[in-house]
Amino acid sequence: MALRRLRKFARTGAEEELDLNDTIHSTAHNGGMLDIKMVQERKNSVKVLLLFDVGGSMDPYVKTCEELFSAARIEFKHMEYYYFHNFVYDGLWQNNNLRYDEVMPTVDVLRKFGRDYKVIFVGDAAMATYEITHSGGSIDFMNREPGSNWLKKFTEHFDKTVWLNPTPKEYWEHTQSTKIIQDLMDDHMYALSLKGMEEAMAYLSR
């Protein structure tokens, strides 16, 4: 899985695992008497913030997104997630069934997570251009600031941000909103494919 390229291991916490090499070495130096050596378990210390576009044109990609989410939960000890619809505005949510009732202000999300989080947006980037560029462009909420401003806040706050697009790359140039988002992301939009994921993880791990 391409996510494994985004690894930075650290030994943290109380959980321990067998240090096989040290156990063999210590046992040999102990006259053959078993001398078990333990070491703190290695954890992937990379911090990841996943933001998924849900609903509408993203429905055909639900299974792909679920697989990505499951893989990320296994791979990263520090993984947080939020949902948005079409584009990021001033509110995000974690329970899509309560998207109108339990919305977290995006500004609070930005305050909650440090610059060292690797941010991964997942969405098809297909929408009316005014949904990105205009106040009130959201089809779900009344957004006072254009979505483009909010995406800029993410790219300025976090050290590394990428956008994974499940739509085949050959179609991107035909969608104006996709081209706008590519520009806002400084071309750090990648296909949600093995090759695209490898490219995205290589960038995030620099």
Annotate each language-model stretch with its function.
Residues 80-120, 126-129:
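Von Willebrand factor
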Residues 54-63:
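Short acidic, Gly/Ser-rich segments with clustered Asp/Glu that frequently serve as metal-coordination loops
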Residues 73-95, 149-169:
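A short, conserved beta-to-alpha structural element at the edge of catalytic cores
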